[in-house]
């Protein structure tokens, strides 16, 4: 929707906050605007604030908090000095125990409003580490000529700009405390204008940086990266083109993996592979999902969008057989290798685009007792519409977007005759508005 950012009244106004939006902003209705909704960054429910308008559109306005006149008892001082500028976190001003409560409300609202479903039970919110948890991410890199400096960080709330970060407390300390050193390193390079992003990922025994560069790195710049890696304990990968162009600069062999000790499983991965961001929450989530699935020794389980085998391989320790299906052929290859490395011969993997017709696929014709799925933000409706759903006793759906979960839940309950037994939020990304969730469906 087009927004008007040119000529409108930016005079600060006083208003009461009634709710929290799905993206972590306070919600107000201005009587002088005919009850028009205004989304106000930095505001919490129950507060009285003075806010400055920042954008207007036909159906809603946007503003930012300039003064809190009456604070919520749930308000806390943000730990990060960049809060309110950096878009990496938007909920640091909300007490930690209340963040999962807010996310539960977002989930339930989506289920009722979009899916027209209500769970029989609300699962307790699942939480893990709140600080230093982010083991995978991507920093934007930008040379600002007017300031004669290089910025490394996440985007600002205004996504046109890169936040000038001195630290990030949600990123693992090995990375979050070294952001200024990264910026200074790039600033001193010959190709400082040719590096648009730096990705980071951490295993249990190594931390890797992948440098996206638009032009070949000079020998001097390559040596600078190697020296930085040796001093700070990083592995460096270079990415001159697409994903397939990623290759190690130093060292040549990097043991990237993470362990799931409860199931005696070790998952190896590559520097741009998808892994769950929050290691402690991931382990709790797997325990939670397998318990909700009620996996039994004689079960055959289908695991869709299986990735590296994050759920598949723990399931293989519990059930008779598990089949994992994933759209990324590289991840499937790694999942097969992981199964072999862990001595699991009861896990099969298939590469398949789950947004396309799979009704004649070999894995689709196999019989299964239960289904676990962990789709991307777009959800799983296309594949759900093809599955022989009535053969599954139970479905556990792990979601990274409450809207697509709600849509798919509506399909399962209102069109396919399943019962939504329970659902609940999981705080994979503390201090952000991101809502991870899990839902359980049973055949009626």
Swiss-Prot record:
Named from the GO MF annotations, one term is:
iron ion binding
Q: Known Pfam families for this protein? A: tRNA_U5-meth_tr (PF05958)
Q: What keywords sit in the KW lines?
A: 4Fe-4S, Iron, Iron-sulfur, Metal-binding, Methyltransferase, rRNA processing, S-adenosyl-L-methionine, Transferase
Identify the catalytic residues.
400 (nucleophile)
Q: What reaction gets catalysed by this protein? A: uridine(1939) in 23S rRNA + S-adenosyl-L-methionine = 5-methyluridine(1939) in 23S rRNA + S-adenosyl-L-homocysteine + H(+)
GO annotation terms (biological process): rRNA base methylation
Which residues belong to any copy of the TRAM domain? 5-67
Q: Where do the coiled-coil regions begin and end?
A: none
* Record EC number: 2.1.1.190
Please report which protein family the annotation says this sequence is part of: Belongs to the class I-like SAM-binding methyltransferase superfamily. RNA M5U methyltransferase family. RlmD subfamily.
Q: What is the protein name given in its UniProt record?
A: 23S rRNA (uracil(1939)-C(5))-methyltransferase RlmD
Species for this entry: Xanthomonas oryzae pv. oryzae (strain MAFF 311018)
